[in-house]
Each structure stands twice: as C-alpha cells, then as structure tokens.
C-alpha cells in the first residue's frame, strides 16, 4: 500500500474486506445497530430514503427496514416506520428496477414524488441558465434534480418526524461522486466506509437478485447522456477504486485518476469554509 492510499483510506474510514460470511453478517449487524442508535439518540421513530433502482439505495433500505423491524419487535411500538420514496423525473427508463427493489425491500410505506415540475420551474426562473451551453445547462439541471430529490425527502421527514438516510459509501466518496447538498445531504449514512463490492455483498446477503446486485451503476441525472454509467464518468472502474481503497495495486493511470479526483473534490467532503 502506498502512503497516499493509506492516507485516503484512513480519511474515509474504509473497512477491511470481509474475511468470510460471518464477518459480513457481523458488519450487517453493526450497521443495523448504528441505525437504531441514530433513531434512539434523535428520539425519533421514522426513517426516510429515496429508492433509485440501484444497489446503493437498495442496500441502505434493506438495512433500514431490518433496523425498524427489530425496533418494533424489541419495543412492541408499532410507530417505528421506514418510508421508501420513489423520486422519478417524469418517467424513469429503469423504473422496473426501482419496482423490483421495492419488492425486495418490503418497505412499511412507499411514497412517490415526481420531481419534474419543481426542477423545470426552478430552471425556468434562473436567468444564469439562459445563455449557457446545452451541455452546461444539462449538467447544472442534473444537480438540481439531485437536490430536489433531497428536498422532497426532507419534506417527508419533516412532516413525519423522521431522519433521512443517505447512500454514500467509500467508493463514491473518494471520487466525490455525489451532488453537494443533494444526495450528499442526509442525517445518517449507513454505507459509509464500505467499498462497492462490499455494498453488493451486503445486498446479496439479504437475498437481493443478481440482476439488481450487479446492475450497472448510473447517476442518470443528465438528459443528454441518459443512463451514463458511473464508471464512464470516473474514468476508472469500481473494481479499481475498491482495490485502491483496500491498498491493493492498481495500474498507474487508474491510481493517478483516483488521487487527482480525490484531491479535486475535497471540498465536497468537508464543512463549508469559514474564517
């Protein structure tokens, strides 16, 4: 492991690879307990999470629903609730995957909010977008979509006295692959410190189908490049990112991309600048 790999892994609190099935189950139990502790400390009984159809939100939701199920069983209090939220922009091209996720999760409640009217209304009122290039406007509006989704989740959480769950994990965090104050905003992040293959392993341990576990990850925020794979945006694969974070050798080109991207996106992982 090179020094910079160790530095980054420590900063992101990267967890070691699962040694065996028992280690995986122990990590699942630890993260479920973490979610339960967050609710207890906040003195709240509701969790809210947006479901995209990808493995990250699927895995976070499975952990959340298990935590809620355990709390109800332990306390006899039926007020404990997990709310899964669908947040499509008009018609989502992989809606079938989102619905398949919901079937696996078996959430207590499912809410649906079409974010398109809010996103379009805001974009239409922002003068700074009027003269931007199509590519720039598409990118900026893509971030508006992510932030609008989080606004919707916090609106539901506010109405129901709940906490919002985020889906960030180490493989996305190292690349800064999230929208600041969008999907990067949450009250608790139960996948934090995991690499991508660990997220998949946890989903698999819950019995999630391989079609969802191994689905090609995509943020799917930009209209000009619908369904663009995360790895195309990264310039490296998740396998390379995972290997880097676990201190394993990666080719020099991938190494350089990961380190440069980590440094460039440092501001996204920190609190706002202050004097």
Swiss-Prot record:
Pathway: Cofactor biosynthesis; NAD(+) biosynthesis; NAD(+) from deamido-NAD(+) (ammonia route): step 1/1. It catalyses: deamido-NAD(+) + NH4(+) + ATP = AMP + diphosphate + NAD(+) + H(+). Deamido-NAD(+) binds at residues 147, 180, 187, 267-268. SUPFAM superfamilies: Adenine nucleotide alpha hydrolases-like. Coiled coil: none annotated. ATP binds at residues 50-57, 167, 196, 218. GO terms for biological process: NAD biosynthetic process. Keywords: ATP-binding, Ligase, Magnesium, Metal-binding, NAD, Nucleotide-binding. The keyword Lyase does not apply. One of its GO terms (cellular component) is cytoplasm. One of its GO terms (molecular function) is glutaminase activity. InterPro entries: NAD/GMP_synthase, NAD_synthase, NH(3)-dep_NAD(+)_synth, Rossmann-like_a/b/a_fold. Its EC number is 6.3.1.5. It holds the Pfam family NAD_synthase. Mg(2+) binds at residues 56, 172. Catalyzes the ATP-dependent amidation of deamido-NAD to form NAD. Uses ammonia as a nitrogen source. NCBIfam families: nadE (TIGR00552), PRK00768.1 (NF001979). Belongs to the NAD synthetase family. Homodimer. This is NH(3)-dependent NAD(+) synthetase. It comes from Pseudomonas putida (strain ATCC 47054 / DSM 6125 / CFBP 8728 / NCIMB 11950 / KT2440). The gene is nadE.
